[in-house]
Design a protein with these regions (language model features):
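C-terminal functional extensions of proteins
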Residues: 252-290
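Intrinsic-disorder-associated, low-complexity terminal segments enriched in Asp/Asn/His/Tyr and depleted
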Residues: 15, 294-297
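Glycine/small-residue-rich loop that forms an oxyanion/phosphate-binding "nest" at active or ligand-binding sites
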Residues: 106-107, 112-141
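Conserved beta-alpha
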Residues: 136-140, 144-199, 278
Length: 305
């Protein structure tokens, strides 16, 4: 009407979490309606992996890197004990009563599989001890499928048809020897081994040290695969580099644990250029010197019977 002034909507200030934005055209109610996402029908249903880890486990974020978007990890830890990394600690964090309590707590979120994320804790009792751990966890979790890191290692070696393996560990000599015995019990020959002698703060080991140890352990032509032990040792980003350099599959504790757990759910772990997870990555390109050597061998052998 003549003589009347139409007023613009009162400015609305929206806090985005980064800065405050002045929105003069929308009221708060209108802004909320514009952001309505209920029609999407989310959130996306999640499938769960229950993870039991030692009290000093520090690499939760690394575990998640192998997990597809539709899967959640539900972690719990064993009770603290004032013992450094050793065979004694391995026995303490793998006691069946401790595992049972952890699995019963995790069962509240209805996981599809239980994973025990500790290498030494699952190889300290040998193959029979590892199987007993799985039985104890499944028994506490209403018959849920259960895996351990050491059991997953043997499963991965079988998947890749590996009979000779080199080992890298952050452990002391006594813990490392126990791993060697476990692998040998499964009929796998250990061709080389490097260990760091650490008893604490293993998660702080830099990638460069892991790579250096791998180069020392995996002698050219001696091993069919390399295994980097300990779920507290960072490995995700070095696996493709080491596989390209050593030209053999490189397995790590966290990798095989997630691979085996997700396999029981009928889904695949995520890991670009990792031979265990991607069959295409197992076809190593032929290097020029290898091609020449093969040609020389054929020429030398012509005419022989």
């Amino acid at each position: 009407m003549h003589g009347l002034t139409t007023l613009a909507p009162e400015p609305t200030f929206v806090n985005t979490g980064v800065s405050t934005i002045r929105c003069p055209l929308f009221s708060q109610r209108e802004a909320g309606a514009a952001m309505d996402v209920s029609f999407l029908g989310g959130p996306r249903p999640q499938r769960g992996v229950a993870v039991v880890a030692p009290f000093d486990f520090a690499l939760d974020r690394e575990l998640w890197r192998w997990v597809p978007d539709e899967v959640s990890l539900h972690l719990t830890r064993t009770p603290f004990v004032p013992v450094e990394v050793s065979l004694d600690l391995a026995r303490l964090v793998s006691e069946h009563e401790t595992l049972g309590e952890a699995v019963r707590a995790l069962s509240a979120v209805a996981p599809e599989v239980v994973a025990y994320a500790c290498t030494s804790g699952s190889f300290v009792g040998g193959i029979a001890g590892e199987r007993a751990m799985c039985a104890a966890m499944s028994g506490a979790g209403d018959a849920l499928p259960s895996v351990t890191t050491s059991g997953a290692l043997l499963e991965a070696l079988e998947e890749l048809r590996i009979r000779r393996v080199a080992l890298v560990t952050p452990y002391t000599v006594s813990v490392t020897r126990a791993l060697e015995r476990y692998v040998a019990e499964a009929g796998i020959r250990v061709t080389g081994c490097s260990f760091m002698g650490l008893t604490r703060r293993i998660w702080q080991v830099p990638y460069r040290d892991v790579v250096a140890m791998a180069r020392r352990a995996a002698r050219p032509g001696a091993a069919d695969a390399l295994f980097i032990s300990c779920t507290n040792l960072p490995t995700y980003d070095v696996i493709p580099q080491l596989e390209a350099e050593l030209r053999i599959p490189v397995l790590s504790a966290n990798q095989v644990t997630m691979w085996a757990a997700l396999r029981r759910m009928g889904t695949r772990a995520v890991g670009p250029y990792q031979a265990l997870l991607d069959e295409a990555a197992r076809a190593w390109p032929v290097l020029p010197e290898e091609a020449q050597g093969h040609q020389d061998h054929q020429e030398h052998g012509e005419g022989l019977t």
